[in-house]
């Protein structure tokens, strides 16, 4: 499929993860991590093969066209080294310009990104973290300039980057219009009122340039302002909608590496006169971990396609993806670490310690670009309006048109229109296409053409799960209505608001994964068509703790073992990895 071809080329271009002389190998990643070394050579290589083009819209000379494309490019990097992935991902902060910049700014920033610029995001401050409205960095307007004062702290690429996406106060009040957004070219500010803050040592991704920048009467031109004065919070939050969705690439890459290493260990390790992989409990654990990874991938794919199909709903979709995808991979990590046993605690006793690096690195994914608490808080305040928008649509729903739109969202074979970032909204009043799709999903599960080849037992289980999702949806809708209709309760029971957001997110995810499978089933490889992995995921996500049926476990595990033995990504996509003896080749990844 076209949306995965660039990532497939990148994977082959980067060479084998087992080549010790390769900057993109696991051994190189571990060596840099031990030295806390910034991956500059890897960054230069990625620029040379044209990956930077995928952050710039096509009308500005780039290749930023397909949501899934950038997701999988970063997944390819993340399975090798989350430090490289995190460093290079700061290019995505240019989205703030595509959202709010004027024509000249868009062209100028596009040229900078295409020439290899290294941007950073300067939102957070040491005293305030994610509380942007409490920001203390100020931008005082003069006739032709802004004068900056204050410090931005804990910023990726703050020192080594050459550009900054900055949020600063342009008003003394604390309201939402007190902040403005700027794009700074640090090359024009050298020694002119700016200074670097010390690099911060980190638990994982130790080679990152996590530092800060300070301003002391630093002057910038008025044309550094993105959008209008007072639009900073709006533009910043819209940009975060996009970057939060792409954070899932970190989880997918780390999850692939951890599950691959743990499975290979189980295949090789012998205990009690038999291979560990032959132990039923271990087989169950690995099958469950694989189901989590596939579900995380599917939720990420649906999110990426949502940027095309219903971008005005993305203010609720993005926090769901950002919360749950890392959580699914954290569950995978908990499972696979138990498979490794004592080897998990030893830093380099197996696979040179790459599992431990991926485990450490992934710990921060649920925090950056908005923690789970921040994301659920954002989601919770939109539950009423999203449900209201969905209810309005239900009254005027054309079933044929609705199904075509659901297919556009879920079906990977259906090409989507280009993303228009200017259509992003701060608040979702349009409804929820995933939640709306459940009725059609249930209809398709009762359609003999859609379910041909499924066993009676599997079909019965999936129909039962889908019906249960509908019951849960109606119950949750009522709870949301009751909560927001009682203003006193809304003020008093804040924890209930978070609980409703959590319930909404988890329901959304299960519907999305089921919907993806229903609409793509006949295009998936046979091992995934039978729904075994899906049932394991749905059962686990619903809190069922009893072991999966043996046939479900074995069907899922067989596919996992096949992906590893044939050197494929652990994915719903048939994605071949670079051969074990492949060398990196500095070749353009664009056709």
Describe every region a protein language model picked out.
Residues 82-104, 129-132, 142-145, 267:
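N-terminal glycine-rich flavin-associated loop
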Residues 202-293, 404-508, 512:
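Glycine-rich beta->alpha junctions and the first turn(s) of the following alpha-helix
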Residues 137-140:
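A structural signal for short hydrophobic beta-strand segments in well-ordered beta-sheet cores
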Residues 149-195:
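A short core secondary-structure module
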Residues 54, 115-124:
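A short, Trp-centered hydrophobic/proline-enriched beta-strand micro-motif
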Residues 303-402:
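Extended amphipathic alpha-helical segments with heptad-repeat/coiled-coil character used for oligomerization
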Residues 263-264, 281-311, 326, 519:
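Loop-to-helix element that buttresses phosphate recognition and phosphoryl-transfer chemistry
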Residues 1-88, 108, 424-492, 501-504, ...:
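Amphipathic, small/basic residue-rich leader segments at the start of a protein or domain
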């Amino acid at each position: 499929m076209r949306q995965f071809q660039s990532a497939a080329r990148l994977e082959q271009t980067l060479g084998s993860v087992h080549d010790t002389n390769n900057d993109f190998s696991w051994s190189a990643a571990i060596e840099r991590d031990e030295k806390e070394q910034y991956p500059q050579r890897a960054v230069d290589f990625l620029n040379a093969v044209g990956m930077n083009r995928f952050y710039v819209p096509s009308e500005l000379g780039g290749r930023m066209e397909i949501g899934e494309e950038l997701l999988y490019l970063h997944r390819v990097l993340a399975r090798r080294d989350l430090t490289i992935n995190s460093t290079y991902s700061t290019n995505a902060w240019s989205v703030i310009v595509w959202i709010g910049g004027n024509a000249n700014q868009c062209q100028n920033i596009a040229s900078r990104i295409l020439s290899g610029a290294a941007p950073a995001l300067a939102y957070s401050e040491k005293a305030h973290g994610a509380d942007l409205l409490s920001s203390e960095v100020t931008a005082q307007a003069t006739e032709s300039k802004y004068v900056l004062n204050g410090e931005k702290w804990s910023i990726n690429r703050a020192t080594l980057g050459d550009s900054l996406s900055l949020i600063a106060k342009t008003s003394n009040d604390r309201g939402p219009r007190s902040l403005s957004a700027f794009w700074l070219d640090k090359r024009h500010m050298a020694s002119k009122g700016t200074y670097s803050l010390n690099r911060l040592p980190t638990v994982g991704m130790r080679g990152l340039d996590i530092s800060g920048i300070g301003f002391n009467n630093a002057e910038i031109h008025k044309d550094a302002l993105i959008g209008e004065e007072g639009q900073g919070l709006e533009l910043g939050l819209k940009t975060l909608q996009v970057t939060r969705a792409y954070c899932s690439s970190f989880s997918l890459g780390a999850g692939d590496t951890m599950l691959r290493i743990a499975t290979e260990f189980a295949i090789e390790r012998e205990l009690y006169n038999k291979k560990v992989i032959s132990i039923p409990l271990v087989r169950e654990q690995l099958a469950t971990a694989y189901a989590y990874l596939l579900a995380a991938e599917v939720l990420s794919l649906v999110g990426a396609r949502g940027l095309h199909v219903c971008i005005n709903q993305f203010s609720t979709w993005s926090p769901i993806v950002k919360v749950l995808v890392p959580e699914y991979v954290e569950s995978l990590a908990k499972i696979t670490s138990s498979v490794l046993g004592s080897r998990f605690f030893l830093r380099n006793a197996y696979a040179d310690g790459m599992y431990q690096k991926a485990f450490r690195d992934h710990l921060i994914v649920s925090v950056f670009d908005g923690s789970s608490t921040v994301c659920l808080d954002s989601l919770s305040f939109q539950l009423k309006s999203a449900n209201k928008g969905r209810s309005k649509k239900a009254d005027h729903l054309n079933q044929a048109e609705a199904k075509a739109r659901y297919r556009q969202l879920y079906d990977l074979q259906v090409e989507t229109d280009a993303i228009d970032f200017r259509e992003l909204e701060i608040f979702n009043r349009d409804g929820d296409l995933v939640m709306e799709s459940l009725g059609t999903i249930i209809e398709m599960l009762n359609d003999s053409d859609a379910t041909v080849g499924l066993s009676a037992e599997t079909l019965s289980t999936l129909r039962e799960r889908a019906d249960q999702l509908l019951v849960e949806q109606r119950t949750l809708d009522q709870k949301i209505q009751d909560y927001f209709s009682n203003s006193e309760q809304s003020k008093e029971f804040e924890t209930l608001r978070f609980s409703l957001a959590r319930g909404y997110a988890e329901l959304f995810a299960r519907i999305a994964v089921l919907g993806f499978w229903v609409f793509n089933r006949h295009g998936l490889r046979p091992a995934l068509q039978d729904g075994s992995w899906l049932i394991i995921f749905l059962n686990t996500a619903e809190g069922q703790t009893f072991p999966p049926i043996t046939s479900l476990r074995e069907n899922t595990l067989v596919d996992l073992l096949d992906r590893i033995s044939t050197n494929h990504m652990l994915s719903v996509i048939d994605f071949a990895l670079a051969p074990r003896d492949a060398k990196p080749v500095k070749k353009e990844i664009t056709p």
